[in-house]
A protein has these predicted regions:
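Conserved N-terminal/central alpha/beta ligand/cofactor-binding core
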Residues: 8-13, 18, 36, 42-43, ...
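Flavin (FAD/FMN)-binding glycine-rich loop and adjacent Rossmann-like elements that form
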Residues: 11, 15, 56, 132, ...
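Beta1/beta-strand and adjacent pyrophosphate-binding region of the FAD-binding site
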Residues: 15-27
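Bacterial carbohydrate/catabolite-sensing allosteric modules
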Residues: 495
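Beta-sandwich interaction modules
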Residues: 534-551, 561-564, 732-757, 761-766
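PGST-rich, cysteine-poor low-complexity/disordered linker and tail segments that act as flexible spacers
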Residues: 576-653, 659-660
Length: 781
C-alpha cells in the first residue's frame, strides 16, 4: 500500500535519456530515418506522439503509401523508392496483399523494435526544448500520457519528422506557411500574389456488408444537407478509405492550431456522406452495409515548411535540375488541392506530372539557422508548389533515409549537417545511401570496399534477347501500344510483330525515344511508317529502322491504334523490358495527354503506361540482332534498378539453374555478401485498401546457394578448419530460400578466405529467367 500526504505540488517522474540522434515523429519519414541511423551504428531515440507508427499510413488514418510510381499512372518507370521504405512495401506485399492497415502497423512496428539501437517512445509528445546556444539544440522534453512520465532527451543531433515541425518551431528555425507568389522563385504555376491558403486535412471511413439489413441513425452533428458538398453527385457506394481523399477541409484555417475544429467538421462530413449513402434512397445496395471504421484523427497534408540552405521549387521538378548534393528523388505530380476542400466547386485536385523523376538536394533537409537540426517528411525546404510533389509519403520516407544516414555520419564524426556539403563528406553520404538500397538518379555506387569489383565475373549464360515467343493470346489495338526495348549506341535493331488482321487496313508504326536518356516519356519520334495490311491471321510485321541510336536508352517501338488489328502476346517476361499503352490512369491524370494551362511552366506530353498484372503482358516479337544488354558486367556497374538500361544480369530462358562465378587473382577474405534482386520497381505496391494478386514479384529470384567451387583452396577459418586445405567437392556456405525482398545481406558466421565463389540461382518461373542487379562482397560483417 502507498499513501501520500497532502503537498503544495508534485513533479512528474522524469526519465533522462542520452543518445546519438533524437528523431521526433514516427511517421514513415521518422521511422526510416531512425532505422537507417540505427543500422549505421547510432543510438537513436524515436519519439512518437501516437500509439502506432506510420503516420498517415497507419491504421489511424489509412492512406496508402505512394511516391514516384504514382499508381503506375505516369511515365516514371521503375521508380519505386528504395532502401527501408522498399523493405516495408515489399514485406507488406508478401504478408498483406489484401491491404489490411492493421497488418501494416505490425510490419512497421516490428522493423523498429527489431533494431536494438532504437529506443521507441510511443504516445509521447515533445512540448519543450533546451538550447546550448542560440542556434544549437541541447535537449527536448516530451510527455507520455500513458505512463505519466516526462522524458528529457539529450543528443548532439536532432531530426524533426513531426509533420508540423514542433522541434523546429520551438527552436526558432525559419519556416513559412502558405503559398509563395510567382515572383519569389520564378515559378510560373504559382499565383501572382502570396496567400495563406493550404491543403486541408482528411478523414476516411470504411464500410462492410453484413449480409442483412442495417439501419443507420446519424449523429446530430452529421451534415444533413448533402448538397452543401458541390460534388455530392460524385459520391459512390463503393468508395471507402483513402478513395475518399477528396473529403478534405481546413485549408483556409490554421492547420496546426485549428486541427480539432477541422476534425469536427470532417466528422460532420464523413457521417453526412454515410447518411446520404444509407438513407437518401439513391443507393439501394447499401441496405446491408454498415460503417466498420471512421478515422478519429485527421490525416494532415500541409502546415509549416522549414527553410534550408536551398528551397526546392517548381523548376527543379519540371526541368529535372541536377544537384551535386542529391541524396534522394521524387516523382509524384505537383498535386495541389483547393483550400476549401470538399466545399469547393473546383475539382478536388489538379495534378501535373514531370517527364521523369527529379533529384532532391541534401541542402533542403536541414535548417538554415539551427545548426544541429535535420528536417524530414513534409516539412523539408520546398516552395508550396514543389511541396505539392515532395509531400507524399514514399518520397518523405526516402528523404528520411537520407537524413538518417547523414545524421549518423554527423553523430559519429562530431559534425553538423552543413559540414557534409564538402565533397569528400557528400561522396561518403551518397555512397553509404547507395549501399543500403537508396536510389539517387544519375549517381552510381563506386565502392572501394566491394571485393566483387576486382573479381572476374562470369555466368553459365547471359540472355541475348531475340524474341518474346507468342502464347497464342491476342489483344486488339484499341489503343496505341509500344514495346520498351533497351538499346545501345549504333544501328537500331529491326523487330517483327505477329498480327491478326480482320479487314484490309493501314497500320501506323513509330519509333520513339525520350529527349533525356534516363526518362521514359517517348516524345521524340524518329521514324514513322504507314504499312498496308491484308486480312489474315498470323501475319508477320517486319519493321526496319534506318536510324542510329546516339546513347544507351529505351526505344519505344509503337503500334498505333487500329481496330482492325490484333497483336499477339507473349507469356514471357524479362527484367527491364515492358509493354506500355498510350492511356491514362484516372487516379492521377485527366486524359492520355497532359495539357496544362498555357504559360504555367509545365510540359505537355503523352502518358505511356503499363498494365498491372495479371495483365500487362509483353507483345510477341522478334529482335534482330538480339539485345545483348544483360551481361554480368551489370552486376558491378553501380545501379540496382533499370534506368536507361536494365542494369541487370539475366540468364537465358533455357537455364533454369544458372550459375554466377566470381574469381580473384589471389584469395580474399569474405565475411559479407550483398545481393540485389528484381522486386519490380515499377510496381507501386499500394500499402492499404488496394488488394494485389501477388505476394512475390514474378521477376524475383527466390532461391540462391552461395558456394565455394570444387578444387579451390580454402584457407584457415572455414568450417573451423586449421591451416590450409583443398576442397574436392563444392562447399555450400549459405543458402537463401523463399526470398521475396529486393536485397539480401548474407553475414557469414565464419568468414571464408577463397579465390572463387559461385552463386547458384533458380529461375523464378519457366517464362521468367533468373536476374540479379548486384553482387557485392566485403571483408567485414
Amino acid at each position: 500500500m502507498m499513501q501520500s500526504s497532502p503537498s503544495n505540488s508534485r513533479e512528474l517522474k522524469t526519465n533522462r535519456l542520452g543518445c546519438d540522434i533524437a528523431v521526433i515523429g514516427g511517421g514513415l519519414a521518422g521511422v526510416c530515418a531512425a532505422i537507417t541511423a540505427a543500422r549505421a551504428g547510432s543510438q537513436v531515440v524515436l519519439v512518437q506522439d501516437r500509439p502506432v507508427l506510420g503516420g498517415n499510413a497507419s491504421s489511424e488514418v489509412r492512406l496508402w503509401i505512394l511516391g514516384a510510381t504514382s499508381h503506375m499512372g505516369n511515365n516514371n518507370r521503375w521508380a519505386r523508392e528504395g532502401g527501408v521504405i522498399d523493405e516495408i512495401l515489399v514485406e507488406n506485399m508478401y504478408r498483406n496483399p489484401e491491404g489490411n492497415p492493421l497488418i501494416l502497423d505490425t510490419i512497421i512496428l516490428e522493423m523498429v523494435v527489431n533494431e536494438s539501437n532504437i529506443t521507441l517512445l510511443l504516445n509521447t509528445a515533445v512540448h519543450d526544448l533546451e538550447k546550448s546556444d542560440a542556434d544549437t539544440i541541447k535537449s527536448v522534453r516530451a510527455f507520455c500520457s500513458q505512463n505519466s512520465t516526462t522524458y528529457q532527451i539529450t543528443a548532439p543531433v536532432f531530426v524533426d519528422a513531426s509533420g508540423d515541425g514542433i522541434v523546429g518551431f520551438l527552436a526558432g528555425a525559419a519556416f513559412r506557411i502558405g503559398t509563395e507568389a510567382s515572383s519569389e522563385f520564378g515559378e510560373k504555376f504559382a499565383p501572382e500574389k502570396a496567400s495563406s491558403e493550404l491543403l486541408g486535412h482528411t478523414i476516411y471511413f470504411y464500410s462492410k456488408d453484413t449480409g442483412r439489413p442495417v439501419k443507420f441513425i446519424p449523429p446530430s452533428f452529421a451534415l444533413r444537407d448533402i448538397t452543401k458538398i458541390p460534388r455530392w453527385r460524385d459520391i459512390k457506394i463503393n468508395d471507402t478509405g483513402c478513395r475518399l481523399w477528396w473529403l478534405e477541409w481546413g485549408g483556409t484555417l490554421d492547420t496546426i492550431h485549428d486541427s480539432e475544429k477541422i476534425k469536427w467538421e470532417l466528422w460532420k462530413v464523413a457521417y453526412g456522406v454515410w447518411n446520404h449513402i444509407k438513407n437518401s434512397g439513391q443507393f439501394p445496395d447499401a441496405a446491408t452495409l454498415t460503417l466498420e471504421w471512421v478515422g478519429t484523427i485527421p490525416g494532415k497534408r500541409e502546415s509549416r515548411r522549414f527553410e534550408g540552405d536551398v528551397m526546392i521549387k517548381q523548376q527543379d521538378l519540371v526541368e529535372q535540375r541536377q544537384h551535386a548534393d542529391t541524396v534522394s528523388f521524387g516523382g509524384w505530380a505537383i498535386d495541389l488541392h483547393p483550400s476549401d476542400g470538399v466545399f469547393s466547386a473546383q475539382p478536388g485536385c489538379q495534378q501535373w506530372h514531370s517527364k521523369g523523376v527529379f533529384q532532391i538536394p541534401y541542402r533542403a533537409m536541414y535548417s538554415r539557422n539551427i545548426k544541429n537540426l535535420f528536417l524530414a517528411g513534409r516539412i523539408i525546404s520546398a516552395s508550396h508548389i514543389a511541396f505539392g510533389s515532395t509531400r507524399v509519403m514514399a518520397t518523405c520516407a526516402h528523404n528520411g533515409q537520407a537524413v538518417g544516414v547523414a545524421a549518423a555520419i554527423c553523430a559519429k564524426n562530431e559534425l553538423q549537417p552543413r559540414d557534409l556539403l564538402a565533397a569528400p563528406s557528400m561522396q561518403e553520404l551518397q555512397r553509404e545511401l547507395l549501399r543500403i538500397g537508396q536510389y539517387i538518379p544519375g549517381v552510381a555506387l563506386v565502392d572501394e570496399k566491394d571485393l566483387a569489383r576486382t573479381a572476374e565475373i562470369t555466368a553459365t549464360s547471359e540472355l541475348k534477347l531475340s524474341q518474346f515467343a507468342p502464347s497464342g493470346e491476342t489483344m486488339p489495338l484499341d489503343a496505341s501500344w509500344a514495346m520498351m526495348l533497351p538499346v545501345q549506341p549504333g544501328a537500331m535493331p529491326s523487330v517483327e510483330f505477329l498480327l491478326d488482321v480482320s479487314a484490309p487496313t493501314t497500320l501506323r508504326t513509330e519509333l520513339r525515344l525520350s529527349s533525356k536518356p534516363d526518362n521514359h516519356t517517348p516524345e521524340v519520334t524518329l521514324v514513322t511508317q504507314e504499312i498496308k495490311l491484308r486480312t489474315g491471321a498470323l501475319i508477320k510485321l517486319p519493321l526496319k529502322f534506318d536510324v542510329v541510336i546516339d546513347a544507351s536508352c529505351y526505344a519505344f517501338v509503337c503500334l498505333m491504334t487500329n481496330p482492325d488489328v490484333a497483336v499477339h502476346l507473349s507469356d514471357q517476361r524479362v527484367t527491364g523490358v515492358l509493354a506500355v499503352k498510350q492511356k491514362f490512369n484516372r487516379a492521377v491524370a485527366k486524359s492520355p495527354r497532359q495539357e496544362p494551362p498555357a504559360g504555367c511552366g509545365i510540359d505537355s506530353f503523352e502518358f505511356w503506361i503499363p498494365q498491372r498484372r495479371p495483365a500487362g503482358k509483353n507483345l510477341a516479337l522478334k529482335i534482330d540482332p538480339p539485345l545483348a544488354v544483360f551481361s554480368v558486367q551489370n552486376l558491378t556497374n553501380g545501379f540496382a534498378r533499370p534506368t536507361n538500361q536494365p542494369n541487370a544480369w539475366v540468364a537465358d530462358f533455357s537455364h533454369e539453374q544458372p550459375v554466377i562465378s566470381l574469381a580473384w587473382d589471389k584469395p580474399q577474405t569474405i565475411a559479407r555478401i550483398e545481393l540485389s534482386f528484381d522486386s519490380d520497381f515499377d510496381h507501386p505496391m499500394e500499402s492499404v485498401l488496394m488488394g494485389h494478386p501477388e505476394r512475390v514479384m514474378p521477376f524475383c529470384v527466390r532461391e540462391v546457394m552461395v558456394a565455394i567451387p570444387a578444387k579451390i583452396p580454402v584457407l584457415a577459418g572455414y568450417h573451423n578448419g586449421n591451416g590450409s586445405k583443398s576442397s574436392d567437392t563444392e562447399r555450400l556456405i549459405f543458402q537463401i530460400a523463399e526470398n521475396h525482398q529486393s536485397r539480401q545481406i548474407i553475414r557469414l558466421a565464419t568468414p571464408v578466405t577463397t579465390d572463387a565463389l559461385e552463386l547458384r540461382l533458380v529461375a523464378p518461373g519457366a517464362n521468367v529467367p533468373a536476374a540479379l542487379f548486384e553482387v557485392r562482397c566485403y571483408s567485414d560483417i
